Amino acid sequence: MYDDLKGKTVVVTGSSKGLGAAMARRFGAEGMNVVANYRSDEEGARETVRAIEEAGGAAAAVQADVSKNECVDALFDAAMFSFGGVDIWVNNAGIEVASPSDRKSIEEWQRVIDVNLTGVFAGCRRAIDHFLDRKMPGVIINLSSVHEIIPWPHFADYAASKAGVGMLTKTLALEYADRGIRVNAIAPGAMNTPINAEKFADPEARAATERLIPMGYVGAPEDVAAAAAWLASDQASYVTGTTLFVDGGMTLYPGFQFGQG
């Protein structure tokens, strides 16, 4: 637990399920005011809010499509209305669509980039403007992926968007470090989330994934939530411009683990 987080306000985009819901719940457990954003899964976001409130925290569910700048502005305004300010902004919302690159439509490509990269920039931009206007320190956490550095066939748009998130994070961190604004990213590996539920229900598919992970098992959303809480806290006050890989070692070239390769 991080005492310095208590009473602060955090916005978490894409909080209906998976990593976003886990981070929102962890922030609530830290005593924070949580704005749980969703695009279409209202019930999921309200379940996140209920869990936070039942644990004694304060939270609000707010609809917004982060690929649209005006919706990001409205999300910020809702956070201001609900809790009077924003201290931490977490850009978690993201999508992925599998298709061979030679058959991937420009519209499909653009949709992924709009949500995963442009939406992240829009959130960063709005949060930074608020921090500067109030002359206050602030924290931004962007959700990247191991595919920030690992190529992913059939997901060229997703991999490109996450590589972009990594460099955007570094650039903004450098640009605003002297203003007390910290910008970091978290890059999850294989996680037990709803988006992976069907795949991991197949024992062979799960085992194949686990062979790519030096630690030998798939991670939990709570692993990412723990990383987010630390990055948001004063314990990470000297950390900015980094991507924290929460991946069980997946990015460590696992084929070389036992002298192979």
Swiss-Prot record:
Highest rank taxon of the organism: Bacteria
Catalysed reactions listed for this entry: 3-oxo-5beta-cholan-24-oate + NADH + H(+) = isolithocholate + NAD(+); 12alpha-hydroxy-3-oxo-5beta-cholan-24-oate + NADH + H(+) = isodeoxycholate + NAD(+); 7alpha,12alpha-dihydroxy-3-oxo-5beta-cholan-24-oate + NADH + H(+) = isocholate + NAD(+); 3-oxochenodeoxycholate + NADH + H(+) = isochenodeoxycholate + NAD(+)
GO molecular function: oxidoreductase activity
GO biological process, one term: steroid metabolic process
One Pfam assignment: adh_short_C2
Stored SUPFAM superfamilies: NAD(P)-binding Rossmann-fold domains
Positions annotated as active site in the UniProt record: 158 (proton acceptor)
InterPro entries in alphabetical order: NAD(P)-bd_dom_sf, Sc_DH/Rdtase_CS, SDR_fam
Binding site for NAD(+): 65-66, 92, 158, 162
EC id: 1.1.1.-, 1.1.1.391
Keywords tagged on the record: Lipid metabolism, NAD, Oxidoreductase, Steroid metabolism
Similarity remark: Belongs to the short-chain dehydrogenases/reductases (SDR) family.
Job description of the protein: Involved in the modification of secondary bile acids into iso-bile acids (3beta-bile acids) via epimerization of the 3-OH group through a 3-oxo-intermediate. Catalyzes the reduction of 12-alpha-hydroxy-3-oxo-5-beta-cholan-24-oate (3-oxo-DCA) and 3-oxo-5-beta-cholan-24-oate (3-oxo-LCA) to yield isodeoxycholate (isoDCA) and isolithocholate (isoLCA), respectively.
Protein name according to UniProt: 3beta-hydroxysteroid dehydrogenase 1
Species of provenance: Eggerthella lenta (strain ATCC 25559 / DSM 2243 / CCUG 17323 / JCM 9979 / KCTC 3265 / NCTC 11813 / VPI 0255 / 1899 B)
Lineage: Bacteria, Bacillati, Actinomycetota, Coriobacteriia, Eggerthellales
